[in-house]
Amino acid sequence: MLEFKNILYPIDLDSEKISSIKTALEFAQLFNCRVHILYVNDIEAGYRHPADHEDAVALKVKEVVAASLLEIADITYAVSKGDTVEEIVKYTQANHIDMIIIGHKHRGRLYASLFDSTDVKLIDNVLLPVLVIPEH
């Protein structure tokens, strides 16, 4: 049987749709494991968010997730700077991540043909199970 101790949830602070975080926390509760919530600030994008600290990430999560779920969850907040996928891969290796849960926003065909989404790049670059949750 698969055993999960550490799950990574990369969060996009630009997105209004992060409902998948609830699924990640419920999954972690089911398997009794820790959830690492990582925000990667893209250096080329500049400082659009005051998210250089874990507190800013925690505040965004508290806006979306019920307090009752947060109280029972084992959460580690983390912030990094650099290429999103590279930083996620580094974090998974440094923190013994067993699985990644990531939200996916549906894009139109034109957008999808021109750009790779972070979740697709991530699946191509990690050797871990990746659970992709549709955002709604």
Walk through the language-model features, giving the residues of each.
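Structural beta-alpha unit
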Residues: 2, 69-100, 106
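Short, flexible hinge/linker loops that cap or flank conserved catalytic cores
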Residues: 1-2, 124
